[in-house]
Amino acid sequence: MRRSTSNGAVVVPATQDGLFHDSPFPIPDSRLIAGVDEAGRGPLAGPVAVAAVVFDPGKPRINGLDDSKQLTAERREQLYARIVDRALAWSVVLIDSEEIDRINIYQATMLGMRRAVEGVAHVAGFARIDGNRVPKGLPCPAEALIGGDALDRAIMAASIVAKVTRDRLMHELHTRHPEYRFDQHKGYSTPVHLAALQTHGPCPQHRRSFAPVRLALQGREGLEPDPGTRDLEQLQVGQLVAPL
């Protein structure tokens, strides 16, 4: 079934399918490999995005692909347009902050990967996933590739699709919650974002299971953090400064 939006910037809860972009080829081919990657695992706000891309061997090779984190926003947008035009099939799934809080970020990422692969399984006979874990319940054989977003072209493409989709959404969320400046940091734990959290408290897009958000919420409610978790929470703040 074809499911799409005009701009791709829609939060898709984990209980729903992702955004599926079909091709005219209905039979999976074991020679066609889906590259899978995520964006937004570490931010304090917004969804985690997972994309899967299967290249069309009959279309020209896309030059300039790389890990999305190594590209400028302008370059990512340019490559995104080429990827979705030349891909045999692609899908992107967004798991929202509420679902992340309910099942945790690791499980949300695994679920997003499974749904993204499901979106291209009518074409791809194999999935190659960035990282060191293969989600359970995939519709085709798969392997994990550590550092795959710098090694495999399909994974590079998936990282770009996931990143661009998520960044577009964060710009949209900025118009709803301008006080947090989601357009600048995309939900990551920057000084500007942390200061806004302290001033305004969390909005519905914040991940309350993440320590800095939980601390801000507790502070506004006049609650003391659990003393045994202070060191862990400080460690998590440091880990979340850089995009994952």
UniProtKB/Swiss-Prot annotation:
Its main location: cytoplasm. Transmembrane segments: none annotated. One of its GO terms (biological process) is mismatch repair. Its cofactor is Mn(2+); Mg(2+). Manganese or magnesium. Binds 1 divalent metal ion per monomer in the absence of substrate. May bind a second metal ion after substrate binding. The keyword Protein transport does not apply. It catalyses: Endonucleolytic cleavage to 5'-phosphomonoester. GO terms for cellular component: cytoplasm; ribonuclease H2 complex. One of its GO terms (molecular function) is RNA binding. Its EC number is 3.1.26.4. A divalent metal cation binds at D37, E38, D130. Residues 31-222 form the RNase H type-2 domain. It is an enzyme of class 3 (hydrolase). SUPFAM superfamilies: Ribonuclease H-like. Keywords: Cytoplasm, Endonuclease, Hydrolase, Manganese, Metal-binding, Nuclease. Pfam families: RNase_HII. It is found in: Cytoplasm. PANTHER family: RIBONUCLEASE H2 SUBUNIT A (PTHR10954), RIBONUCLEASE HII (PTHR10954:SF18). Belongs to the RNase HII family. Endonuclease that specifically degrades the RNA of RNA-DNA hybrids. NCBIfam families: PRK00015.1-3. This is Ribonuclease HII. It comes from Xanthomonas axonopodis pv. citri (strain 306).
